[in-house]
Amino acid sequence: MSSSKMNGRSIRINRVPATIFAILLTIVLVYFLNFHQEERPAIYGKLRSDNPNRVNLRKMLIAAIQASQRGGLEVLDVARSRQLKVRSKGQTDEGVNDPFTDADGRSHCVMKQGLQRIFPRVRIFSEEDKEHCKESHSYDLDPTVLHETAQVPDVSVNAQDVTVWVDPLDATKEFTEELYEYVTTMVCVAVAGRPVIGVIHSPFNGQTAWAWVGNSMSEYLAGLHPPHGQENELPIITVSRSHTAGAKDLARGIFGEQVNLLTAAGAGYKVLQVVANNATAYLHTSKIKKWDICAGDAILHALGGTMTTLNDQLIRYGPDESPVNTEGLLATLEKHDKYMDQLVKYRTAHNGQLA
């Protein structure tokens, strides 16, 4: 006990409650600090694994979703500024101009640098790898990008088995034409050459479709209804609006002149049309880059669908594989074997040719 005098009166201060309060405050602080030391890495993940030779796929899924969404914000920002600074990378094999904009470059820098900082030993391929990034970009992992009911386990694999494919802006030509519905940003994670995680983000409607094969998927994909077409119903084939001649002719040759054709842009968008049952198949007859198709391949696989070359071969996405698929592709949610059989019959009838 201690005492002091004020206005001639003696005041006694009881130190016991103050001591108890100090002890309780210390306990709370210790608990808080321990929680953040032990639990935060489990939730948010250390930026780099304790074992740099291993990669946690749960963290990679979170990072892939964030990367695609952050890239999408860059695309939106450039679109709103109306300062696209369009230049040409040349022409495609079909003679179509292949444009490049500031949105492609800015999205690339945000997406690839962010992923590479978190996973420094993983091989990451981006469509715009030649682009020089003037600024350094990074972000912390945020698990809130996953919906609450997502069943996402902690699974680790060897870093050397992982390859990431990034498309910073799919459908650039349509982006310059303000056909924004076709525009997507995409990330795909392949393990041992096969796609296991796919993310397709649509910046202009805010929808992010993601799937981890055998584990979980976004609420949007989980809420889709399975196909319910009749057996004899004509299929709806989605083909590219930029180079449609070969695909249209092949579709008519296989399924008849009355086949329904849905022209669209962007490989990511066309896969989303298949998974949403707006198209029964996505047909592409010329070469296509793997960052355009890897995410869609993973999502289709997670939903029970299939993507193959026109020679009915699964597509490989390993680090030593060519970044270009030269054998065309057929992507379906169901009846893949049936459509492939019809394609083989057409090829046989035309001396092995598809056009």
Swiss-Prot record:
Secretion signal span: none
Look up the EC number in the record and give it.
Answer: 3.1.3.25
Q: Which PROSITE patterns match?
A: IMP_2 (PS00630)
Query: Catalytic activity annotated for this protein?
Result: a myo-inositol phosphate + H2O = myo-inositol + phosphate
Could you say which enzyme class this protein belongs to?
hydrolase
**Cellular component terms (Gene Ontology):** cytoplasm; endomembrane system; membrane
Binding residues annotated for Mg(2+) 1, in chain numbering: 127, 167, 169
Q: Which UniProt keywords apply?
A: Hydrolase, Magnesium, Membrane, Metal-binding, Transmembrane, Transmembrane helix
Question: Where are the membrane-spanning stretches?
Answer: 16-36
Task: Note the topology in the membrane.
Answer: Single-pass membrane protein
GO terms classed as biological process: inositol biosynthetic process; phosphate-containing compound metabolic process; phosphatidylinositol biosynthetic process; phosphatidylinositol phosphate biosynthetic process; signal transduction
Identify the InterPro entries for this entry: CysQ/Inositol_MonoPase (IPR050725), Inositol_monophosphatase-like (IPR000760), Inositol_monophosphatase_CS (IPR020550)
Domain of life according to the entry = Eukaryota
Q: Where in the cell is it found?
A: Membrane
Fetch the Pfam families from UniProt. Answer: Inositol_P (PF00459)
Tell me the SUPFAM superfamilies matching this sequence. Carbohydrate phosphatase
- Gene Ontology MF, one: 3'-nucleotidase activity
Matching entries from CDD domains are given as: IPPase (cd01640)
- Pathway info: Polyol metabolism; myo-inositol biosynthesis; myo-inositol from D-glucose 6-phosphate: step 2/2
Tell me the protein family, please: Belongs to the inositol monophosphatase superfamily.
Q: What is this protein called?
A: Putative inositol monophosphatase 3
- Look up and give the organism this protein is from: Drosophila pseudoobscura pseudoobscura (Fruit fly)
